[in-house]
């Protein structure tokens, strides 16, 4: 509802910033917790914010240095009508131990669960006007974690591919020890989703909960300096875009197997904001995903950017990708939210286009 005040966590990050832009465009007033003045300044100076030029009454910031601390959001939630919790307080810098180290559980699972419970507790105790909390979850929260690593055998993946998972799918939370940071991340998403849903069920607060479950998010990142964000994604998919490969010749060898799921950042942001509307029922979830074949990345890019391939800026070849299909039922996204999800073709065009903008190669 236009004019309502939204507390947006994660608003200084990739997805959260895109949500922020969508909120402002749709007339919401937004309060963004930030860890530092530097992060606030970076958002204020970003191109879309500068172009929209929202008044101070429509874009506000509050310093929250430690978002995992008990009561961290107690002040931020006051007088707020709605909350979008897109922050993911994962302490990856602390997860430096060997695989299975307890540090993985603390850095990923504990941090993520505490983040979700912290915002819900603050909303329950201090946010008396809050009517809805929209949380960013992930498809990895509701699929077997082994599908996203090498732990699943080909036979297990083949059998799993016959299953169509949807917004009501739930899986047991994988227990430690964790084999890798990716395994711990999947566990963190499953555990934090369960913790949030259990909290709503056990406490019956004055607000409801909607979970948005995107797959791998692709899209422009205005806040990234250089090609740090786009390059990280594209360097694995498109030979010639690895900023760490000075010769542009040795990168992209070997075999890579990955789940073929992707979604456009703008679509994910739109889903979060649309979920705030009063005509959308609470206490439900939405899965956002488009099937992707990583093997198609170079052919798609060649179609949209032929000159860059002719010049040698991008090169055909690279690693041999094997796409693991993982099926999702996303019908609610269009039927309920009215969002038609972008194709993988659109994602590649947008991300490669931004890469060229940031490198001045257009």
Regions found by a protein language model. Name each.
Residues 306-362:
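C-terminal amphipathic/interface module of NAD(P)-dependent oxidoreductases
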């Amino acid at each position: 509802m236009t004019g309502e005040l939204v507390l947006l966590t994660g608003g200084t990050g990739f997805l959260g910033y895109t949500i922020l832009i969508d909120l402002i465009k749709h007339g919401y007033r937004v309060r963004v917790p930030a860890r530092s003045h530097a992060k606030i300044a970076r958002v204020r100076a970003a191109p879309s914010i500068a172009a929209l030029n929202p008044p101070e009454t429509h874009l506000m910031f509050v310093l929250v240095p430690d978002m995992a601390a008990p009561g961290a959001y107690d002040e931020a939630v006051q007088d707020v009508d709605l909350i979008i919790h897109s922050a993911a307080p994962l302490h990856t810098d602390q997860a430096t131990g060997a695989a299975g180290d307890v540090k993985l559980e603390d850095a990923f699972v504990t941090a993520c669960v505490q983040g979700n419970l912290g915002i819900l507790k603050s909303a329950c105790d201090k946010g008396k006007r809050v009517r809805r909390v929209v949380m960013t979850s992930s498809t990895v929260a509701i699929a077997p974690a082994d599908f996203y690593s090498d732990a699943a055998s080909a036979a297990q993946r083949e059998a799993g591919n016959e299953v169509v998972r949807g917004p009501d799918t739930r899986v047991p939370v994988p227990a430690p020890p964790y084999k890798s940071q990716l395994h711990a991340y999947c566990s963190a998403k499953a555990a934090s989703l369960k913790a949030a849903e259990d909290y709503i069920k056990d406490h019956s607060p004055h607000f409801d909960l909607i979970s948005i479950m995107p797959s791998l998010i692709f899209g422009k990142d205005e806040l990234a300096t250089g090609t740090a964000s786009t390059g990280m994604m594209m360097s694995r998919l498109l030979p010639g875009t690895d900023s760490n490969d000075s010769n542009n010749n040795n990168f992209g060898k070997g075999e890579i197997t990955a789940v073929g799921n992707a979604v456009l950042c703008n679509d994910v942001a739109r889903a979060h904001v649309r979920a705030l509307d009063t005509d959308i029922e609470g206490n439900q979830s939405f899965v956002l995903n488009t099937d992707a074949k990583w093997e198609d990345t170079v052919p798609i890019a060649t179609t949209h950017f032929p000159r860059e391939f002719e010049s040698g800026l991008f090169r055909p070849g690279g690693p041999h990708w094997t796409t693991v299909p993982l099926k999702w039922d996303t019908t609610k996204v269009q039927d309920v939210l009215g969002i038609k999800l972008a194709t993988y073709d659109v994602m590649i065009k947008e991300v490669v286009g931004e890469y060229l903008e940031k490198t001045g190669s257009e």
